[in-house]
């Protein structure tokens, strides 16, 4: 009896000590082992659990059963998703993996310190185009610095010549980036995206506006059609407009039996079918139209030829006049004509 009472007294203490290290593992997955303190706590709890199980096997089995019942009771408060994701065996395997430092989540490799310093050396207060030019220049200098130690071991390598060429190239690159910044090429790298987005937005807006207008016009047309049908159904035939009655009359075909016995039978029978005659002569009319078009074109060409010939004759006449007057300037007759008239007493 005493042994039974002692075991019953010791069971709650054992379950309490066993629940303490397992309490963090009952939380959601966000509490995975990531810190050293948490790993130490887990290892300490597992060691205590092993000590308790090793000291008394019967008590260990009873504690394991109590722990399973407690975990099942606590699992009722969890969502089905958490129950499916975090079973006890998987949780224990996670603990063992974390203690063995196996299958840990691997993070990305850190950036090279030179690259971070390269970005930090560029001021944030500069414009985007200026920062891009400075980044190009700094990248070239960084590449030269990293290339220099590899080339030192090569044969016939001159460090001074290499540095001189690198400095000259850096100066040329600086002038080139300045020129790109002045002519606006670097600014286009940041403006084209916004322009394309603005153009796409304006195009979408215009398309939506056109679609809206189309729907409005279609609705308006349907409304006018309904109004016309309503008017035609309500207005009697006597009050219809003259144009509509005329169209109706032209569409009606007269039955020949209505005028067979009339006095105008012979006249109507001898009346030629002008519509048929015109339809038969459609080909002739088409040829006449082509001939008239050709005549009109030839007349236009003759008019243009006459205009060109008159202009050419005027030009030739002006040239002949100029040449004839130039020849008369050196003639003695023209010089004599240019002499002033002498006074009358001298002639006497």
UniProtKB/Swiss-Prot annotation:
Cross-link Glycyl lysine isopeptide (Lys-Gly) (interchain with G-Cter in SUMO2) per UniProt, renumbered positions: 253
Compositional bias of kind Basic and acidic residues: 87-104
Bias (Low complexity) ranges: 338-348
InterPro entries: Dsn1/Mis13
Primary site of residence: nucleus
The keyword Nucleus belongs to this UniProt entry's keyword annotation: yes
Domain of life from the UniProt record: Eukaryota
Quaternary assembly: Component of the MIS12 complex composed of MIS12, DSN1, NSL1 and PMF1. Also interacts with KNL1, CBX3 and CBX5. Interacts with KNSTRN.
Cellular location(s): Nucleus; Chromosome, Centromere, Kinetochore
Region (Disordered): 1-105, 325-348
GO BP, one annotated term: attachment of spindle microtubules to kinetochore
Modified residues (Phosphoserine): 25, 75, 79, 107, 123, 331
Keywords in alphabetical order: Cell cycle, Cell division, Centromere, Chromosome, Chromosome partition, Isopeptide bond, Kinetochore, Mitosis, Nucleus, Phosphoprotein, Ubl conjugation
GO cellular component annotations of the record: cytosol; fibrillar center; kinetochore; MIS12/MIND type complex; nuclear body; nucleus; spindle pole
Originating species: Mus musculus (Mouse)
UniProt keyword Signal, yes or no: no
Record's function text: Part of the MIS12 complex which is required for normal chromosome alignment and segregation and kinetochore formation during mitosis.
Biased composition (Polar residues): 33-46, 70-86
Record protein name field: Kinetochore-associated protein DSN1 homolog
């Amino acid at each position: 009896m005493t042994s039974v009472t002692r075991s019953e007294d010791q069971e709650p203490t054992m379950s309490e000590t066993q629940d303490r290290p397992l309490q963090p593992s009952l939380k959601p997955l966000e509490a995975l082992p990531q810190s050293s303190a948490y790993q130490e706590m887990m290892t300490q709890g597992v060691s205590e659990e092993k000590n308790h199980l090793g000291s008394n096997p019967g008590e260990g089995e009873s504690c394991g059963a109590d722990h399973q019942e407690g975990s099942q009771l606590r699992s009722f408060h969890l969502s089905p998703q958490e129950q499916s994701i975090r079973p006890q065996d998987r949780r224990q395997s996670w603990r063992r993996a974390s203690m063995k430092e196996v299958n840990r989540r691997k993070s990305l490799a850190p950036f090279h310190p030179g690259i971070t310093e390269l970005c930090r050396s560029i001021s944030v207060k500069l414009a985007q185009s200026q920062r891009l030019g400075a980044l190009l220049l700094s990248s070239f200098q960084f590449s030269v610095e990293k290339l220099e130690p590899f080339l030192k071991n090569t044969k016939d390598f001159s460090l001074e010549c290499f540095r001189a060429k690198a400095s000259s190239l850096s100066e040329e690159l600086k002038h080139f980036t300045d020129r790109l910044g002045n002519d606006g090429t670097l600014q286009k790298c940041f403006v084209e995206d916004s322009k394309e987005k603005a153009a796409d937005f304006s195009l979408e807006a215009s398309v939506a506006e056109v679609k809206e207008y189309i729907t409005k016009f279609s609705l308006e047309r349907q409304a006018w059609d309904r109004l016309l049908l309503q008017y035609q159904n309500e207005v009697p035939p006597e009050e219809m407009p003259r144009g509509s009655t005329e169209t109706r009359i032209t569409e009606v075909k007269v039955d020949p039996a209505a005028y067979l016995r009339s006095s105008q039978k012979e006249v109507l029978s001898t009346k030629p079918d002008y519509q048929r005659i015109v339809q038969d002569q459609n080909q002739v009319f088409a040829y006449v139209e082509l001939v008239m078009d050709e005549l009109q074109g030839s007349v236009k060409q003759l008019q243009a030829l006459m205009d060109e010939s008159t202009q050419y004759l005027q030009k030739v006449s002006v040239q002949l006049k100029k040449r004839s007057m130039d020849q008369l300037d050196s003639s003695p007759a023209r010089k004599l004509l240019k002499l002033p008239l002498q006074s009358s007493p001298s002639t006497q």
